Amino acid sequence: MAAADTPSATLRHHDLCSRGIRLARKMRSDVTDLLDIYVERQGLDASISVAAVDGVPTAAVERWAEQTGTQRLLDNLAAYRAFRTLLAQMLEEQRELLGDTDAELGPALAAMLLQVSAFVYHLEELLELESRGAPAEEGSEPPAPPRLSLFEQKLRGLRVLRELAQWAVRSVRDLRQLSKHGPGSGAALGLPESQ
Protein backbone atom coordinates (compact mmCIF):
# COMPACT_ATOMS: atom_id res chain seq x y z
CA MET A 1 0.00 0.00 0.00
CA ALA A 2 1.49 3.34 -1.03
CA ALA A 3 2.08 5.91 1.68
CA ALA A 4 -0.55 8.20 0.17
CA ASP A 5 -3.13 5.40 0.41
CA THR A 6 -2.71 4.54 4.09
CA PRO A 7 -5.65 5.15 6.41
CA SER A 8 -3.70 7.79 8.34
CA ALA A 9 -2.84 9.63 5.10
CA THR A 10 -6.47 9.48 4.02
CA LEU A 11 -7.60 10.82 7.39
CA ARG A 12 -4.99 13.60 7.26
CA HIS A 13 -6.06 14.43 3.69
CA HIS A 14 -9.69 14.73 4.75
CA ASP A 15 -8.72 16.83 7.79
CA LEU A 16 -6.58 19.20 5.69
CA CYS A 17 -9.38 19.60 3.15
CA SER A 18 -11.93 20.31 5.91
CA ARG A 19 -9.66 22.86 7.57
CA GLY A 20 -8.92 24.42 4.19
CA ILE A 21 -12.63 24.80 3.51
CA ARG A 22 -13.10 26.54 6.86
CA LEU A 23 -10.12 28.83 6.18
CA ALA A 24 -11.44 29.73 2.72
CA ARG A 25 -14.93 30.44 4.06
CA LYS A 26 -13.49 32.69 6.77
CA MET A 27 -11.32 34.42 4.19
CA ARG A 28 -14.37 34.98 1.96
CA SER A 29 -16.30 36.51 4.86
CA ASP A 30 -13.39 38.72 5.88
CA VAL A 31 -12.60 39.88 2.35
CA THR A 32 -16.26 40.85 1.89
CA ASP A 33 -16.01 43.02 5.00
CA LEU A 34 -12.66 44.37 3.79
CA LEU A 35 -14.20 45.28 0.43
CA ASP A 36 -16.81 47.40 2.20
CA ILE A 37 -14.11 49.19 4.21
CA TYR A 38 -11.91 49.60 1.15
CA VAL A 39 -14.66 51.12 -1.01
CA GLU A 40 -15.63 53.51 1.78
CA ARG A 41 -12.06 54.58 2.66
CA GLN A 42 -11.00 54.98 -0.95
CA GLY A 43 -14.12 56.95 -1.89
CA LEU A 44 -15.12 54.50 -4.61
CA ASP A 45 -18.54 53.48 -5.87
CA ALA A 46 -19.14 49.83 -4.94
CA SER A 47 -20.79 49.18 -8.30
CA ILE A 48 -17.84 50.45 -10.35
CA SER A 49 -16.70 48.03 -13.02
CA VAL A 50 -12.99 47.32 -13.07
CA ALA A 51 -11.43 45.65 -16.09
CA ALA A 52 -8.90 42.87 -15.73
CA VAL A 53 -5.63 44.02 -14.22
CA ASP A 54 -2.25 42.51 -15.10
CA GLY A 55 -0.96 40.21 -12.41
CA VAL A 56 -4.33 39.66 -10.71
CA PRO A 57 -5.33 35.99 -11.07
CA THR A 58 -8.91 35.37 -12.13
CA ALA A 59 -10.91 32.60 -10.51
CA ALA A 60 -12.86 31.74 -13.64
CA VAL A 61 -11.61 28.61 -15.37
CA GLU A 62 -12.68 26.75 -18.48
CA ARG A 63 -13.36 23.06 -18.04
CA TRP A 64 -13.26 23.21 -14.25
CA ALA A 65 -14.79 19.74 -14.00
CA GLU A 66 -11.94 18.22 -16.01
CA GLN A 67 -9.17 19.40 -13.70
CA THR A 68 -7.37 16.92 -11.50
CA GLY A 69 -7.02 17.47 -7.79
CA THR A 70 -3.36 18.32 -8.22
CA GLN A 71 -4.16 20.84 -10.97
CA ARG A 72 -6.69 22.50 -8.69
CA LEU A 73 -4.20 22.72 -5.83
CA LEU A 74 -1.48 24.10 -8.10
CA ASP A 75 -3.86 26.72 -9.53
CA ASN A 76 -4.92 27.73 -6.03
CA LEU A 77 -1.33 27.90 -4.82
CA ALA A 78 -0.22 30.09 -7.73
CA ALA A 79 -3.19 32.41 -7.24
CA TYR A 80 -2.74 32.83 -3.49
CA ARG A 81 0.98 33.41 -3.88
CA ALA A 82 0.13 36.21 -6.32
CA PHE A 83 -2.47 37.60 -3.90
CA ARG A 84 0.09 37.56 -1.11
CA THR A 85 2.37 39.77 -3.22
CA LEU A 86 -0.47 42.04 -4.34
CA LEU A 87 -1.81 42.50 -0.80
CA ALA A 88 1.69 43.33 0.46
CA GLN A 89 1.94 45.98 -2.28
CA MET A 90 -1.47 47.37 -1.35
CA LEU A 91 -0.52 47.50 2.31
CA GLU A 92 2.73 49.31 1.55
CA GLU A 93 0.94 51.83 -0.70
CA GLN A 94 -1.65 52.39 2.01
CA ARG A 95 1.05 53.02 4.61
CA GLU A 96 2.90 55.42 2.27
CA LEU A 97 -0.30 57.32 1.64
CA LEU A 98 -1.77 57.47 5.13
CA GLY A 99 0.96 56.30 7.46
CA ASP A 100 -0.44 54.96 10.71
CA THR A 101 -3.39 57.37 10.72
CA ASP A 102 -5.81 54.84 9.21
CA ALA A 103 -6.88 52.63 12.08
CA GLU A 104 -9.23 50.48 10.02
CA LEU A 105 -8.07 49.78 6.45
CA GLY A 106 -4.38 49.18 7.16
CA PRO A 107 -4.97 46.61 9.92
CA ALA A 108 -7.69 44.92 7.83
CA LEU A 109 -5.29 44.60 4.87
CA ALA A 110 -2.57 43.26 7.18
CA ALA A 111 -4.98 40.68 8.63
CA MET A 112 -6.02 39.58 5.14
CA LEU A 113 -2.37 39.26 4.13
CA LEU A 114 -1.81 36.96 7.12
CA GLN A 115 -4.83 34.84 6.17
CA VAL A 116 -3.64 34.52 2.58
CA SER A 117 -0.13 33.58 3.77
CA ALA A 118 -1.59 30.92 6.07
CA PHE A 119 -3.69 29.56 3.22
CA VAL A 120 -0.59 29.34 0.98
CA TYR A 121 1.10 27.27 3.69
CA HIS A 122 -2.02 25.10 3.99
CA LEU A 123 -2.09 24.45 0.23
CA GLU A 124 1.61 23.55 0.31
CA GLU A 125 0.83 20.98 3.04
CA LEU A 126 -1.91 19.47 0.89
CA LEU A 127 0.42 19.25 -2.09
CA GLU A 128 3.01 17.50 0.07
CA LEU A 129 0.38 14.96 1.11
CA GLU A 130 -0.58 14.50 -2.54
CA SER A 131 2.98 13.16 -2.94
CA ARG A 132 3.81 16.22 -4.97
CA GLY A 133 5.86 18.89 -3.34
CA ALA A 134 4.77 22.47 -3.78
CA PRO A 135 6.62 24.14 -6.64
CA ALA A 136 9.17 26.71 -5.66
CA GLU A 137 8.16 30.30 -6.06
CA GLU A 138 9.39 31.57 -9.40
CA GLY A 139 11.52 34.35 -8.04
CA SER A 140 12.38 35.60 -4.63
CA GLU A 141 11.23 39.07 -5.56
CA PRO A 142 8.59 39.85 -8.21
CA PRO A 143 9.33 42.66 -10.62
CA ALA A 144 8.38 46.06 -9.31
CA PRO A 145 4.90 47.00 -10.46
CA PRO A 146 4.60 49.96 -12.80
CA ARG A 147 4.01 53.22 -11.00
CA LEU A 148 0.28 53.85 -10.98
CA SER A 149 -1.63 57.00 -10.28
CA LEU A 150 -3.50 57.12 -6.99
CA PHE A 151 -6.80 56.40 -8.75
CA GLU A 152 -5.27 53.46 -10.65
CA GLN A 153 -3.94 52.07 -7.36
CA LYS A 154 -7.43 52.29 -5.88
CA LEU A 155 -8.96 50.48 -8.86
CA ARG A 156 -6.25 47.80 -8.83
CA GLY A 157 -6.87 47.28 -5.11
CA LEU A 158 -10.59 46.93 -5.72
CA ARG A 159 -9.94 44.35 -8.44
CA VAL A 160 -7.53 42.43 -6.19
CA LEU A 161 -10.07 42.20 -3.37
CA ARG A 162 -12.94 41.23 -5.69
CA GLU A 163 -10.89 38.47 -7.29
CA LEU A 164 -9.67 37.28 -3.90
CA ALA A 165 -13.30 36.91 -2.85
CA GLN A 166 -13.99 34.85 -5.98
CA TRP A 167 -10.93 32.71 -5.37
CA ALA A 168 -12.12 31.97 -1.85
CA VAL A 169 -15.38 30.63 -3.32
CA ARG A 170 -13.48 28.60 -5.91
CA SER A 171 -11.14 27.23 -3.24
CA VAL A 172 -14.09 25.93 -1.23
CA ARG A 173 -15.39 24.17 -4.35
CA ASP A 174 -11.96 22.79 -5.20
CA LEU A 175 -11.32 21.51 -1.69
CA ARG A 176 -14.78 19.92 -1.50
CA GLN A 177 -14.04 18.02 -4.69
CA LEU A 178 -10.61 17.06 -3.41
CA SER A 179 -12.00 15.83 -0.08
CA LYS A 180 -14.27 13.36 -1.89
CA HIS A 181 -11.18 11.54 -3.11
CA GLY A 182 -8.16 10.18 -1.33
CA PRO A 183 -4.71 11.69 -1.40
CA GLY A 184 -2.74 11.24 -4.59
CA SER A 185 -5.81 11.00 -6.82
CA GLY A 186 -4.74 12.35 -10.17
CA ALA A 187 -8.03 11.80 -11.96
CA ALA A 188 -10.35 14.59 -12.95
CA LEU A 189 -12.46 15.23 -9.88
CA GLY A 190 -15.48 17.13 -11.13
CA LEU A 191 -16.87 14.47 -13.41
CA PRO A 192 -19.94 12.57 -12.21
CA GLU A 193 -19.10 9.23 -10.73
CA SER A 194 -20.86 6.09 -11.89
CA GLN A 195 -22.54 4.23 -9.07
Swiss-Prot record:
The keyword tRNA processing does not apply. GO terms for cellular component: axon; cytoplasm; extracellular space; glial cell projection; neuronal cell body. SUPFAM superfamilies: 4-helical cytokines. Nervous system. Keywords: Cytoplasm, Developmental protein, Differentiation, Growth factor, Neurogenesis. GO terms for biological process: astrocyte activation; cell surface receptor signaling pathway via JAK-STAT; ciliary neurotrophic factor-mediated signaling pathway; muscle organ morphogenesis; negative regulation of neuron apoptotic process; negative regulation of photoreceptor cell differentiation; neuron development; positive regulation of axon regeneration. The keyword Magnesium does not apply. It is found in: Cytoplasm. Its main location: cytoplasm. Pfam families: CNTF (PF01110). It comes from the Eukaryota. Transmembrane segments: none annotated. GO terms for molecular function: ciliary neurotrophic factor receptor binding; cytokine activity; growth factor activity; interleukin-6 receptor binding; protein-containing complex binding. Belongs to the CNTF family. CNTF is a survival factor for various neuronal cell types. Seems to prevent the degeneration of motor axons after axotomy. This is Ciliary neurotrophic factor.
